[in-house]
């Protein structure tokens, strides 16, 4: 029988995450990262022992910690000793559109296929997407006591980076 490991990142709406976990069946295990910026207690109360929580990281968009928490989730799956046939990455805001049987059947029909989405940014013409890879995004991973100051500094640095000829190679 195939077994799925769901790796989930969340930062809000513990009741929704509990509904997501309840909607997916007992042929799956759940590994969850809760952003360190969020209060974990509602998630612990809502999920109990239905999930495995991994060490927490403070997450900001575009920050290196996004890679770190994904590594934590994958390490938990690999060290579980359970032979999963699939690892599925979800956010805490997702919800299944298919039945559990349809999900398992689809993966069984596509055993040799990995589903990883992406697009080529080499020829990207959308300015908002292009600047995400050509410009630096400083200050994302630094801990701040005041989110107001952090946001002001990020906006100022974004404007400065757009003016200066500093680009990633």
Language model region names:
Residues 1-169:
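ER/Golgi luminal nucleotide-sugar-dependent glycosyltransferases, focusing on the catalytic module
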